[in-house]
Amino acid sequence: MNRNAAILGLGRRGEAWARLCLDAGWSVRAFDPAPNAASAVARLPGLKREDTISSAVRHANWIICSVPDRLELIQMVVQRAQAEAPQQAVVAVASPVFDIEAIQGCAIRPGQVLRLCETPGGGVALDVTERNAPDLKSLAQKLTMELAALRSLGDDPTTQDDGADAESA
């Protein structure tokens, strides 16, 4: 499987997920309209910043939505990403706030939307529902275990919340 990730939102969480995907050897494209997102791109060699959600997700099979924790914004970004991404693309929402069912409820393909949850000690858990097919759950679990292993090797800012994500969208 080609590992092409799209990171939507380059605040603290988005930058950390982009770093993990790059460290795992993935091709990573990102979208964030905020001018300060350019600094994240400068810190991450190999990250390609795109001008639109459409161009960021065009070839992605794994999309991480890390926009500020506003439900309407998350729903809008998930809908747009699914409208433009390949049919099989998985959308992982990195939000500690909203229930996965609220996020899936707006999706074009709700069975391909899940939530990433950070756990104490640097782990990553998946929040899924019965809408997610067993094979998708298995694939997502494998990929998140790989990323969690990389997270455990160093200081990971995805677990820190200084409000930076609120400024990036």
Predicted regions and their residues:
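Short alpha-helical
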Residues: R12, N36, E72, F98, ...
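NAD(P)+-binding Rossmann beta1-loop-alpha1 motif at the extreme N-terminus of oxidoreductases
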Residues: M1-K48, Q112-V113, G121, E146
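Hydrophobic packing residues within well-ordered alpha-helices of enzyme cores
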Residues: A38-V41, A81, I103-Q104
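P-loop/Walker A phosphate-binding loop and immediately adjacent motor/lid segment at beta-alpha junctions
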Residues: N4, R12-R13, W17-C21, R29, ...
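Rossmann-like NAD(P)-binding element
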Residues: P33, L44-V90
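Rossmann-fold dinucleotide-binding core
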Residues: V90-D156
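Interdomain hinge/lid region at the active-site interface
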Residues: G163-A169
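Structural motif
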Residues: L8, F31, E50, S66, ...
